């Protein structure tokens, strides 16, 4: 158990969203005092709008960047292969799919120690948390869409993943 309280972490997250660190304010809602949510628009690519959900745990703050589409039942096995191949090479965070409803999201975490060290480290950590998922969606999102909407042509799932990982 860490010496910092969950309430302290919630306050750091609120300060970030309220622009205390850098003047950039975010639109967000607070649910149950430990869950924050909002939306992000304007990401480049075929999937452009995301919801974010941040949960404040006892040791970690987790951000989910949720795509605005749900994978149809008949495509969930193919998408799970795509996700598995992508996740194998990721160092930080991972893609997830809910097999019950097809929800797609990217999950990233930071430790409470990074958020509570000092304001500069907290800002850097929160920026990382908020941008990592978006960067991953920008990198892999077009080929998620290609797989979901039939734009992949004769490319295999492995080819789609390799294309994402070799493009600059």
Question: Where do the PLM segments sit?
Answer:
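Short, internal acidic amphipathic alpha-helical interface segments
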Residues: 67-105
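Short, charged/polar, Gly/Pro-enriched secondary-structure boundary elements
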Residues: 43-49, 112-115
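Charged, low-complexity intrinsically disordered regions
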Residues: 95-151
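Short, highly charged C-terminal tails/helix-capping segments
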Residues: 144-168
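Ser/Thr-rich, low-complexity intrinsically disordered terminal regions
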Residues: 19-47, 61-63, 67-68
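Amphipathic alpha-helical segments
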Residues: 4-28
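Short histidine-centered catalytic/ligand-binding loop motif
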Residues: 2, 64-72, 119-122, 126
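Short, conserved beta-strand/beta-arch hydrophobic-aromatic motifs that form part
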Residues: 52-54, 59-74
